[in-house]
Amino acid sequence: MALDRTTKGVLLGFASFAVFSFSDACVKLIKGQLPPYESAFFGAVFGLSILPFLLRKGDHWIDILSTTNLPLWLVRFLAYPMGVIGSVTAFTHLSMAEAFVLIFLQPAYITVMSVFFLKERVGFRRWSAVAIGFLGVLIVLRPGFRPLSIGHLGALFAGLGGAVSVVAFRAARGKEKNVSLFGAGILGGVIVCGLLTFPSFTPPSGDQWAKLAGYGLLAAVANVLTMWAARQAPAAYIGPTQYSQMVWAILLGYVLFGDGADLPMVAGIVLIVASGLLTLIRENVRGTPLPPSVAGERHVAAALVPNPA
């Protein structure tokens, strides 16, 4: 029986976020043997393979550097490396489930930033979703009851970097070409992380090269799958599929790294996922463009935020 377009889109969405999860597992398998900015650099280099898929008829490679708003372009250029270095740090030092659940607070950051930078009006329900999300984080972190690490700080920067990118996407929506919107971030990853890498460059081993390639190329494949998904189904159906990453995080964490999840962790996961879903539902009702995948600062907004430019 032939599947309708919406069903195909949703299935592609689930597939894309499964691939994203395997990408993050690849960088975690490096186990911190390379600096996070070096892993981020090579991930961005391999991620350049997505750029041809962003080119539309009439686009040119030079359009990556073209912009009608240089400050916003620079924000995207800097936000991506901040987010991806943070996510690599988080996945290196935390369990996959804990890293994901903290990065998944990104929709709450977006709500708060949208008030100040986009002058959006936020009602009681969206503020309630923010409060639920922060409560979930407190339950996961349990400050004062367990030590916090650089991995938790990395997850914070990953979420903030992704949120800054999404707010910049929304501010530039309809005014920039997709290849400029997302090329700025990928270039930022290559250049900024490259500048941090080369003064103390550690040559990867053969095994590490394979993991770095898996990290960057799988993320690129996942981005392409998400774009295909968004061509089949509305963003309102694709957006929630990103939360399937929590299932993959728990499964991969257990199988590959022997991670477990205690009761407070599960409770925090439920609250943070509920917070994100509430935000997605409210933004769909309001007609606000939905954010991209929140884990690992992924540039899939090309699919979830259609751009006529």
Which residues fall in each region the model found?
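Membrane-interface interhelical linkers
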Residues: M1-A15, L48-V75, F124, E176, ...
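Glycine-/small-residue-enriched transmembrane alpha-helix faces in small-molecule transporters
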Residues: M1-E38, P147-A171, P291-A309
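Juxtamembrane helix-entry segments on the extracytoplasmic side of multipass membrane proteins
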Residues: D4-G9, F41, L65-N69, V137, ...
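Hydrophobic alpha-helical transmembrane segments of multi-pass membrane transport proteins
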Residues: A18-F22, C26, L74-T89, F157-A168, ...
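C-terminal transmembrane-helix exit sites in multi-pass transporters
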Residues: T89, P107-S128, V247-V266
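Helix-helix packing/entry segments at the starts of transmembrane helices
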Residues: F100-L105, A172-L187, N223-Y254
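Hydrophobic transmembrane alpha-helices of multi-pass small-molecule transport proteins
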Residues: R125-L141, G162, P264-E283
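C-terminal-most transmembrane helix of multi-pass membrane proteins
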Residues: V247-A309
